[in-house]
């Protein structure tokens, strides 16, 4: 049972932390684990309780907890969440709540296209000179789409047929 809890611990420890190895968890991810797994129910166990337990089990000046400290925290939260049960039984119930859980990304902000926003952000609907600033895929062309680049490769400024002299003379 503890190995499944350890896997859940690692999944939450790495969540949102690109530099994390999954061996230590910060307070943010600890709170997320408690919320997503249903340990924090808002009545018997609140977010304040979770923060207090985290501060209690972590080292004095540390910002993260190890899996051993996490187990201590779960024992404390288990006794609070499942009142009247033995500490081992409460811990077992906590681990059952954690089984197979992953960090949830519900409620994460997504791009919206409400009202006129879709009209303004869809490059295929652009008209006039703005249309020339994007290719067919909608990717910007950069400076080539913003400025008319003149070709100054002729003999004089008005000469348009650069490189055609030899072709005419060889007939």
UniProtKB/Swiss-Prot annotation:
Region of interest: Disordered: 120-171
InterPro entries listed in its UniProt record: EF-hand-dom_pair, TPP/p25
Keyword Ribosomal protein: no
Subcellular location: Cytoplasm, Cytosol; Cell projection, Cilium, Flagellum
Pfam families membership: p25-alpha (PF05517)
Record GO biological process: cell differentiation; microtubule bundle formation; microtubule polymerization; positive regulation of protein polymerization; regulation of flagellated sperm motility; spermatogenesis
Compositionally biased spans, kind Basic and acidic residues: 129-149
UniProt keyword terms in alphabetical order: Cell projection, Cilium, Cytoplasm, Differentiation, Flagellum, Spermatogenesis
Annotated family: Belongs to the TPPP family.
PANTHER family named in the record: P25 ALPHA-RELATED, TUBULIN POLYMERIZATION-PROMOTING PROTEIN FAMILY MEMBER 2
Summary of the function given for this chain in its UniProt record: Probable regulator of microtubule dynamics required for sperm motility. In contrast to other members of the family, has no microtubule bundling activity.
Protein name as catalogued: Tubulin polymerization-promoting protein family member 2
Source organism (scientific name): Bos taurus (Bovine)
């Amino acid at each position: 049972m503890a190995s499944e809890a350890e896997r859940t611990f690692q999944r939450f420890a790495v969540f949102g932390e690109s530099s994390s190895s999954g061996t230590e968890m910060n307070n943010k991810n600890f709170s997320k684990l408690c919320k997503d797994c249903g340990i924090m129910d808002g009545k018997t166990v609140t977010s304040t309780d979770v923060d207090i337990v985290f501060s209690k089990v972590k080292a004095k000046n540390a910002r993260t907890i190890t899996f051993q400290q996490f187990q201590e925290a779960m024992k404390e939260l288990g006794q609070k969440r499942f009142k009247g049960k033995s500490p081992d039984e409460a811990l077992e119930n906590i681990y059952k709540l954690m089984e197979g859980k992953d960090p949830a990304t519900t409620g994460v902000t997504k791009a919206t296209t409400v009202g006129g926003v879709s009209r303004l952000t869809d490059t295929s609907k652009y008209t006039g000179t703005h249309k020339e600033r994007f290719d067919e895929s909608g990717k910007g062309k950069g400076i080539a789409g913003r400025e008319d680049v003149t070709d100054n490769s002729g003999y004089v400024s008005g000469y348009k047929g650069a490189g055609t002299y030899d072709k005419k003379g060889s007939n």
